[in-house]
Regions:
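Conserved cytosolic headpiece of P-type ATPases
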Residues: 1-173
Length: 173
């Protein structure tokens, strides 16, 4: 599977247009969400790094690798003891996957990945291009769902996923 389009920081890319994730302030969160909500891994075959696992997850990891994101370090951290607080795998009835990760500062970050119609309702904010959380109104949610996601992506039969996160202090957790 290949990533055909991406919507990040209010910008949409299509086809061969490639957003430079290294220059986007939200790229680390995107990469972490993809890696921590994935069981895919990277192997070396004939001197080349190759992503292995679920085809959707492999497509997303290949996109990150093509965007020069250091996925191996994230995958390594994913495998360390104590990183995960809990994980609920994706299934067809829930239409989402949830992973709670203990951060190095002691806080917990919960990542969601799944069908946009199941994730968007859980969101209260979005990140702007500078990485700042700004409120996400019901009107903006509808616009994202009906214009950005449905018209641009789902109407082209793209498998469409949304990622989100929420941070908790240790006391809140």
């Amino acid at each position: 599977m290949t990533v055909m389009a991406l919507y990040i920081s209010g910008q949409s890319t299509h086809g061969s247009q490639n957003v430079s994730l290294n220059s986007d302030k939200n790229s680390t969160l995107l990469a972490e969400s993809v890696i921590y909500n994935s069981s895919a891994h990277v192997e070396v075959e004939n001197g080349q790094k190759v992503a292995k696992g679920n085809v959707t997850e492999v497509g997303m990891i290949k996109y990150l690798m093509d965007s020069k994101v250091e996925v191996e370090s994230l995958i390594h951290r994913r495998g360390q003891d104590g990183t995960f607080e809990f994980q609920i795998p994706f299934n067809s009835s829930r239409k989402r996957q949830t992973s709670a990760v203990r951060l190095t500062n002691g806080n917990v970050r919960v990542f969601l990945k799944g069908g946009p119609d199941f994730i968007i309702d859980k969101c209260s904010h979005t990140l702007d291009a500078q990485g700042k959380a700004v409120p996400l109104s019901e009107e903006q949610k509808l616009d994202l769902m009906n214009v950005t996601v449905v018209k641009q992506y789902a109407s082209k039969c793209y498998r469409t996923l949304l990622v989100a996160y929420c941070d908790y202090t240790d006391a809140q957790w």
